[in-house]
C-alpha cells in the first residue's frame, strides 16, 4: 500500500464522509477521481457504489472521463495535482460534485515529492480561488466547509495549524443554463 495511506487522516475522512452523507444517499453510484484508495473502501463500507478512474492523465485527456459514469463525482484531494483542473471539471460525467482540497497555508510551502513527479501540488487554493474555478467551469456551489488539521508536533507552524483551516470541501451541482453561460460539452 502507498506509504501516504499508512496512517489514515481520520478527521478528514470523518468530515468528508459527513458531507457526502448529507448530499448523497446510501446506494448512490460515485465516480471517485483517482485510483482506488482507502477512502474508496470507506465509501463502499458505508453503502456507496464506487468506481475509480484508472490513472489516466486527465490533464492531457480530460475527454477520457466520458468513459465513466456516476450519479456524483468525488474529487477528493485531486484537483491540486492537476495542471489544468478547469478542463477536468468541465468534462465530469455527472451533475453533482464533491471536492476537497488542501488550502494554501501562508506559513508553509506547497507540497512536493521529489521522488514522484505525480505526487506534487500544482495548486494549493485559497477558498475563493476554488470557488471561482468551479463556477467558471460550470458548477454552482451549494455547500462549503473548512477545517483545521493539527499535526501534534511542537513549533510555531504546528501551533498555527490548530487555528488555520487546512482543508476545504465544496458540494456543487452543474449549471445547465445560466445567465452568464450555457454548458457545452
Language-model regions, residue ranges each:
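Conserved N-terminal segment of class I S-adenosyl-L-methionine
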Residues: 1-72, 86-91, 95, 117-132, ...
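Active-site flanking residues adjacent to catalytic metal/cofactor-binding acidic residues
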Residues: 31, 76, 99
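Generic detector of well-ordered alpha-helical packing
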Residues: 33, 78-81
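A short beta-strand submotif of the Rossmann-like class I SAM-dependent methyltransferase core
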Residues: 72-78
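Flexible, active-site-proximal loop/turn residues at the rims of small-molecule/cofactor binding pockets
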Residues: 79, 88, 103
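Short N-terminal helix/helix-N-cap motif within the alpha/beta-hydrolase-1
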Residues: 83-87, 109
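Short, glycine-/aromatic-enriched active-site segment of Class I SAM-dependent methyltransferases
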Residues: 99-123
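A structural motif corresponding to the C-terminal end of an alpha-helix
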Residues: 133-139
Amino acid at each position: 500500500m502507498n506509504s501516504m495511506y499508512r496512517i489514515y487522516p481520520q478527521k478528514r475522512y470523518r468530515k468528508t464522509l459527513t458531507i457526502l452523507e448529507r448530499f448523497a444517499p446510501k446506494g448512490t453510484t460515485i465516480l471517485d477521481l483517482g485510483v482506488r484508495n482507502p477512502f474508496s473502501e470507506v465509501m463502499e463500507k458505508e453503502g456507496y457504489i464506487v468506481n475509480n478512474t484508472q490513472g489516466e492523465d486527465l490533464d492531457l485527456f480530460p475527454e477520457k472521463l466520458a468513459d465513466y459514469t456516476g450519479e456524483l463525482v468525488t474529487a477528493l484531494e485531486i484537483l491540486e495535482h492537476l495542471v489544468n483542473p478547469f478542463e477536468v471539471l468541465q468534462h465530469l460525467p455527472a451533475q453533482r460534485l464533491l471536492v476537497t482540497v488542501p488550502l494554501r497555508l501562508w506559513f508553509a510551502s506547497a507540497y512536493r515529492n521529489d521522488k514522484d513527479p505525480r505526487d506534487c501540488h500544482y495548486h494549493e487554493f485559497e477558498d475563493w480561488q476554488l470557488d471561482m474555478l468551479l463556477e467558471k467551469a460550470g458548477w454552482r456551489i451549494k455547500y462549503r466547509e473548512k477545517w483545521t488539521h493539527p499535526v501534534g508536533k511542537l513549533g510555531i507552524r504546528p501551533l498555527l495549524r490548530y487555528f488555520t483551516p487546512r482543508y476545504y470541501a465544496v458540494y456543487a451541482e452543474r449549471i445547465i443554463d445560466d445567465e452568464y453561460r450555457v454548458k457545452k460539452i
